[in-house]
Regions:
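A short SAM/SAH-binding and catalytic strip from SAM-dependent methyltransferases
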Residues: 152-168
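Rossmann-like AdoMet/SAM-dependent catalytic core
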Residues: 201-296
């Protein structure tokens, strides 16, 4: 299945990013299947940008909550965020970390985790890996109810997942989870990374290339801009929302960090960087009115 292959490709790209020194992740190489994938400097920096932003969001949410949090990772694939958090701080305040994905990916991930003591030793009652179909909204809610506790601060993350599903489905999924699982009035955050802008020349090529690969951005036309993503979050009841292109997100990275990244690899064509990263957005939304966590 094409979606399973995209998960493995994403994993291999993170591995290359780690080997170049961008990220500290001692676990992701355990999941690598394709050792031939090599990123361009542009792709390495983009991978660093979104990976770091997601991790900083979760860390910031935990700090602001002041109590153990719950994490829901939609379409987690071979992501290692839970293991990175617990590796860096065994007492990281997470009550439950629930990863949801297709059955084949979940089975494979479970097998690899059990095979490596470095990962298996970090798995306890806090970590839950569940197979499910995100189209089955009620089924997802049922699974989450079995593992999560209403009233506990919860952060939902979706990295390049919802764009593969019709917008009406993902909106209903978020609404149902917020209403039936997390409980109204509970501190909730939603963080997403998705492709956007399908209608210009670059966007059309991006969409067509994916179709040739056997997959489809079924939700990209429903939320084609950062503003559309922000509007959805507002309509779902989030009070504080930040939705920006990845190009603009990078502009918030402190200069000293950018200098460090340049020492790892130089980007020669910033026009290409700007074009590509204008076609991806990062969304952070909170039900609270306090400022959002600082991403960088």
């Amino acid at each position: 299945m094409a979606l399973i292959q995209t998960a493995h490709d994403a994993c291999s790209r993170v591995v290359h990013c780690v080997r170049k020194g961008y990220l500290d992740d001692p676990f992701v190489s355990f999941f690598e299947k394709d050792h031939t994938i090599v990123n361009s400097p542009l792709m390495n920096r983009g991978t660093w940008l979104r990976t770091t932003a997601f991790e900083n969001c979760v860390r910031g949410f935990a700090t602001a909550s002041g109590q153990p949090i719950q994490v829901i990772s939609f379409g987690a694939g071979m992501d290692t965020l839970y293991f990175r958090l617990k590796h860096s701080d065994p007492k990281f305040p997470v009550q439950k970390f629930v990863e949801l994905d297709l059955a084949d990916l979940v089975t494979e991930k479970e097998r690899i985790i059990k095979r490596h003591k470095e990962m298996h030793s970090l798995v306890g009652s806090q970590y839950v890996l569940v197979s499910c179909n995100l189209y089955d909204v009620n089924g997802v809610a049922k699974v989450l109810k079995e593992h999560l506790q209403g009233g506990t601060p919860t952060i939902m993350i979706a990295e390049m997942v919802f764009v593969y599903i019709e917008g009406s489905v993902t909106t209903n999924l978020l609404r149902t989870v917020m209403k039936d699982v997390i409980d109204a009035g509970t501190s909730t955050m939603f963080v997403a990374y998705d492709a956007i802008q399908p209608f210009d020349r670059f966007g059309k090529v991006m969409v067509e290339s994916l179709q040739h690969f056997g997959a489809e951005f079924k939700g990209i036309s429903d939320f084609p801009t950062p503003e559309a993503h922000a509007q959805r979050c507002t309509e779902l009841g989030f009070k504080t929302v930040q939705s920006v292109t990845m190009k603009n997100l990078y502009l918030s990275v402190p200069r000293q960090i950018q200098i460090h990244l340049n020492k790892l690899e130089m980007i020669d064509d910033w026009e290409e960087w700007n074009l590509m990263h204008d076609h991806y957005c990062f969304v952070v939304a909170s039900t609270g009115e306090d400022p959002l966590p600082k991403l960088f």
